[in-house]
Amino acid sequence: MSDLTHKIAVLGAGSWGTALAALLARHGHPTVLWGRDAAMVDTIDRTHENARYLPGIALPDSLRATTDLQAAVADATWILVVVPSHAFTETIRLIAPLRPPGAGVAWATKGFEPGSGRFLHEVARDILGPSVPLAVVTGPSFAKEVTLGLPTAITVHGDDAAFAQVVADAMHGPTFRAYTGDDMVGAELGGAMKNVLAVATGVADGMQLGLNARAGLITRGLNEMLRLAAVIGARPETLMGLAGLGDLVLTCTGDLSRNRRLGLALGRGQSLDEAIREIGQVVESVQTADEVMRQAEHHGIELPISNAVRAVLHGEITPEAGLKELLARERKPEYPQTLFT
């Protein structure tokens, strides 16, 4: 926990935005949480509870909430964006003219820009210009557990080492460890791909295929992360750390994961629409699967698990057919000889 205090604007009043805003406020930083839903934001500000996304969990009395974006970012030392990936570009555009001089921008959004498949740091850099410090906050972290003060470890990767350290220091505390790095491509890749792979393990568990199948899918899913990382310039150690393996294991095994729950529902025979309606929150994997496969096709590599998830989500094949295709694939060495060279 840093001895220095910062005024921080957290944009996005969903479960993860609320959890991070509460964490920062508890660490003594004047924190403002911005959201679009006036009724929900008013309730958070008055009652210090996000009854929709984190019911029954008390938020710090010092945490303020507002729907006024200009007021939220005014005089902010830095800004933390925590919105779904489909809203990321719009949010960055909104804050670009409002951002105080010198304020860095970090985000805990996971995914790619829908439609273009661009990494979020590319989107932010394009809109904000070359001089704004940027950082991505990622790693294995369920919002509910963070808000309850349970032990958590995350990582902050940035293109400005000093800013990444500022963000990590503000978050780091007695039960929340924050590491740093400078591989934004790898950090964002891990955070996006794990959502797709969590659907695969959820489907397998929904079909009651056993723990062996789950372990196999997680491990071969990591293989797919590493293969894509190798061709886009990410470092393998990033994917073997909190941003990759850590987030992958949590999202594939923890029932608080929306993407795993989507897979469970599909594996039990529910339709995609039924499953999303039952979850009641944004499920990033539906769009992210398309963008992952766009990247794979552009670079000419095979990602069979991710491709099967994409096909199931689009209704092109059933989960049973996807499983059959994966099991029928030609045998080959576990890792290409050139993967780590």
UniProtKB/Swiss-Prot annotation:
Keywords from the named record: Cytoplasm, Lipid biosynthesis, Lipid metabolism, NAD, NADP, Nucleotide-binding, Oxidoreductase, Phospholipid biosynthesis, Phospholipid metabolism
PROSITE patterns per the UniProt record, alphabetical: NAD_G3PDH (PS00957)
A single GO cellular-component term on record: cytosol
Protein residues bound to NADPH: 15-16, 36, 110, 143, 258, 282, 284
Pfam families found in the cross-reference section: NAD_Gly3P_dh_C, NAD_Gly3P_dh_N
InterPro entries named in the record: 6-PGluconate_DH-like_C_sf (IPR008927), 6PGD_dom2 (IPR013328), G3P_DH_NAD-dep (IPR006168), G3P_DH_NAD-dep_C (IPR006109), G3P_DH_NAD-dep_N (IPR011128), NAD(P)-bd_dom_sf (IPR036291)
Statement: the UniProt record of this protein carries the keyword Methyltransferase: no
Location of this chain's protein in the cell: Cytoplasm
Molecular function per GO: glycerol-3-phosphate dehydrogenase [NAD(P)+] activity; NAD binding
UniProt-annotated binding residues for sn-glycerol 3-phosphate: 110, 139, 141, 194, 247, 257-259
Enzyme Commission code: 1.1.1.94
Any GO BP annotation: glycerophospholipid biosynthetic process
Keyword NADP annotated: yes
Pathway field: Membrane lipid metabolism; glycerophospholipid metabolism
Location of the active site: 194 (proton acceptor)
Tree of life domain: Bacteria
Family note: Belongs to the NAD-dependent glycerol-3-phosphate dehydrogenase family.
Function: Catalyzes the reduction of the glycolytic intermediate dihydroxyacetone phosphate (DHAP) to sn-glycerol 3-phosphate (G3P), the key precursor for phospholipid synthesis.
Annotated HAMAP family: NAD_Glyc3P_dehydrog
Protein name, per record: Glycerol-3-phosphate dehydrogenase [NAD(P)+]
Species whose genome carries this gene: Xanthomonas axonopodis pv. citri (strain 306)
